[in-house]
Amino acid sequence: MKRHLNMLREFSIPLISGVIVALVWANISPESYQHFDHDRNFGPFSFHFIVNDFFMVLFFGIAAAEITQSCLPGGDLYPLRKAVNPLLATIGGVVGPVLVYVVLNALMGDPSLLRGWGIPTATDIALAWLVASLVFGKRHPAISFLLLLAIADDAIGLAIIALFYPDPNLPAAPQWLVLVLSGMGAAALLRRGNAQSYWPYIILGGGLSWAGLFMAHLHPALALVFIVPFLPHPHREKKHLFEEDMRDLSPLASFEHEWKVMVDFGLFLFGLANAGVTFGSIGAATWLVLASLVIGKTGGIFFMGWLGRRLGYPLPSRVGGKELALVGLIAGIGLTVALFVAGEAFTDPARQGAAKMGALMSAGCAVLALAAGRIMNVKRIT
């Protein structure tokens, strides 16, 4: 049973299932879908609010834990020189899509769509890892390169959400951010007091951080991003991303181990809450987002990875031009975070739906990457 559940997680079946159910529901009965998703059917809360502002706290908390672990000695982003080329590629993978989006939008002459520039900046780590494993094989050095890039990519994505996408309906109230600082202070004191359970950090520090972001009209989903780095952890990281060290019982590792499964399966709810757009929603924003992910990611990552090599920061062994181009194409799968940002970037339902369709259609990068891998005869290492 456990093997089958792990297979479902590995192939991102919960997220994909949620997306499919939402798409079918929204296209068969859009009124009932909107009622379920946005009306206050759960006391004072809507299903959409519960998923995006409560459940996604854990999703971004797990992302913060993975980034924190990767920055420890022995982790994938330590020391810095080891990660220079992937980090340069990350810059290309963020700047490239933004440039494509801004230039295409200028050519289209629709200033109202400019706010969506942040949608194509992040990569869906889980789906990218799955596709890369199918293209390269699980032991190919290109996998580690892609995951390093995706981790840093997500860190930038979190910063973009926090800084550039406040609630457009409510003015920011930065005075409430003192609660976020209080939460961080509480977490620091707990760590100094050697609290060896993650619960006090999450409840006290996370609770204060969530309240501060909510009252400041920012994104409470990011509450644990400010708290998780304070969780006690070993001095060295012994495993790579998606590898579990069952001997690591630190609060940081325990938080990730105990919540990652629930988060992976809970992504069904995220897909259900955010992917319900009608096929008639396809519009200018769809093609802006899709082109930015496919062209901007591929071109940006390829160019900066090539430039890094020219500057003396080598690519991993067995990663040449064709592998680098495939990594860029796979990184164009922007499903989860892109859907989240699309929901924050636009309040107009038509523009929001069109942008979300672009994020959903970016899953087609998987098909393109699999086909390109065959055509270019990429050697798989299993």
Swiss-Prot record:
Protein name, entry field: Na(+)/H(+) antiporter NhaA 1
GO molecular function: sodium:proton antiporter activity
Transmembrane segments annotated in the record for this chain: 10-30, 45-65, 87-107, 116-136, 145-165, 170-190, 211-231, 252-272, 275-295, 326-346, 353-373
Signal sequence, start to end: none
GO cellular component, one term: plasma membrane
Localization per record: Cell inner membrane
A Pfam family hit: Na_H_antiport_1
HAMAP family for this protein: NhaA
Catalytic activity: Na(+)(in) + 2 H(+)(out) = Na(+)(out) + 2 H(+)(in)
Topology of this chain in the membrane: Multi-pass membrane protein
Principal location: membrane
Membership in a protein family: Belongs to the NhaA Na(+)/H(+) (TC 2.A.33) antiporter family.
Function per UniProt: Na(+)/H(+) antiporter that extrudes sodium in exchange for external protons.
GO process terms (BP): regulation of pH
Secreted among keywords: no
Keyword Zinc-finger: no
Family matches, as PANTHER family: NA(+)_H(+) ANTIPORTER NHAA (PTHR30341:SF0), SODIUM ION/PROTON ANTIPORTER NHAA-RELATED (PTHR30341)
Keyword terms, alphabetized: Antiport, Cell inner membrane, Cell membrane, Ion transport, Membrane, Sodium, Sodium transport, Transmembrane, Transmembrane helix, Transport
Name of the gene this protein is made from: nhaA1
Organism: Pelobacter propionicus (strain DSM 2379 / NBRC 103807 / OttBd1)
